[in-house]
Amino acid sequence: MTDAAGTYRLIGAFVDELVRCGLRDACTSPGSRCTPLVLTLAGDERLRCHSHIDERCAGFFALGLAKASALPVALACTSGTAVAELLPAVVEAHEARVPLIVLSADRPPELREVGAGQTIDQLKIFGGFAKWFFEVGTHETTSERLRWIRALACRAWATAREGRPGVVHLNFALREPLVIDALPPLEGQGRADAAQLLQRSPQRGEDREAAARLRELIADARRGVLVAGRHERATLLGRAAAAFCESVGWPLLADPMSGARRGRAAIAHYDALLRAPGFLAERVPDVILRVGDLPVSKPLRTWLQALTDIPQIALDPECAYQDPAGVVSDWLAAEPAATLQALVSHGTRIDSDWLEGWRSADERAAEAILSVLSTDDLSEPAVAAELGVLLPRHATLFVASSMPVRDIETFWPVRSDPPRVLCNRGANGIDGTVSSAFGAAAAGDGPVVLLIGDVALAYDLGGLLAASRLDLKLTIVLLNNEGGGIFDFLPVSGSPMALADDLYTRHIATPTGLEFAGAAALYGLSYETVSDVPAFRAALERALAGRGSAMIEVHGERTANMELHRRAWSAVSDRLR
């Protein structure tokens, strides 16, 4: 048997075991040294193999797919800078707790540090952002080696998925020759029988000790608040949080990415309410329960940070310690949905006026915001509000960081059946957003809409190639306000130093000046631009009903957008007086 054939047998056994563990999707990018990895993955008919021309897009595509499917995705690349291109996606996956299995090809040890081409130090290249690193040598193909590499695949799958999900990096040192005439048959090689070597632990359920401790902590609470941050991994959290709050009479302040902005206890406009002078004076809670990641809303984070004398209890199965202000008094390592469900039957309404006061204020805030957005003019807040109403429950909204995710937080309504909302909020970057959204679309769980600004779209224009190359459908709603609108809300926008010689516009706001209709045509997306609410509704309906990917562009102006936000917040304050 040639060395190449032995390499393919080992990699074939490795991939076969990943598939037996549950692997469904793999992403590849071209190269020579990675040939055995790519051909083995692409040749396995049980896998969906998504081919990309560059590694950065491939990494973010795999990230979005893993987010949407809640399963690890394999990601194969060649040696050299190709591996380094994956770092941004690996960082986001680590911070957002998304499982990825990176399979990098490398030169064998004798070709390292001797000037061989396309050879860099790939060992632990991702540093602490990889949950586990392992250097894989192929060597001889013995029965012992086949058993070992299957066990390695099981360990990689389990490590990526169990506990705190994250990134596993396996570095394959591959010697030439790298090609053979045909893939060798597996026939269960390396197994004594057909039993899976890995038995995945069942999904964590109610932690009785944690539930008992939580029941004790909130037993005397008359005025509690539940804050639900992004928790994309817990599909049942939304319903559990809503049911719990309704049973105990607590307001539910839920980020749309938590899936919990539903039910009669949900307060949709807390971001605007918490900005209103005097609103909080009569609404001091005696306990706060926190689930999920830190909320996007700065007023909410500021309020939580100020409540240093109020018990704040965090439910987090991995105890990720998302508490930069150090105000959490109790950490309970428990699965939030199961724990809240266990407490519903034990909850008693303690102070009905407490929740009704929040709900009344929320209704007045909704009326105030509607009065500001009541015209047919299409603004960025109006787009966020319209998407919250128009998207079907089985849809997914992928939101870019920066202004789009903040507008969703502020203007997204309460619904009994909200669509899923995803966003790369682990490290909060705007890079790779288009590719991540296409990855979510590849999961095949209903229509996917991407809400994105012009700078974030320009950052990842290459990601649009997935529309034609992978035959995927994505509806892109582009908010084009000629630059990074988020900076207009920050102190730098009024800095005399930044405003001198127009430094703010050129170096901070950075308008792109691009005609995105040309980009849509280049990558095969249908395109239309809209300027009023009825036209937007019609365009969205056409895009969702159509076959291919589409881009709907909404033009705006940054200064007008900032003023509209301020008018909305001011209207809420006036309505509460």
Predicted regions and their residues:
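Glycine-rich, anion-gripping cofactor-binding loops and their flanking helix/strand elements
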Residues: 228-313, 317, 321-324, 415-446, ...
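Glycine-rich, acidic loop regions that bind phosphate or pyrophosphate groups
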Residues: 104-156, 254-362, 544, 553
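Phosphate/pyrophosphate-binding active-site segments
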Residues: 2-6, 136, 140, 303-405, ...
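Active-site diphosphate/adenylate-binding microenvironment
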Residues: 11-14, 19-22, 29-33, 37-38, ...
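N-terminal cofactor/phosphate-binding cores enriched in small/glycine residues
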Residues: 6-92
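Thiamine diphosphate
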Residues: 103, 110-123, 407, 412-577
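Conformationally flexible catalytic loops at phosphate/diphosphate-handling active centers
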Residues: 5, 150-155, 159-220, 370
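A short, small-residue-rich loop immediately preceding and capping a beta-strand
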Residues: 24-28, 48-50, 68-107, 284-292, ...
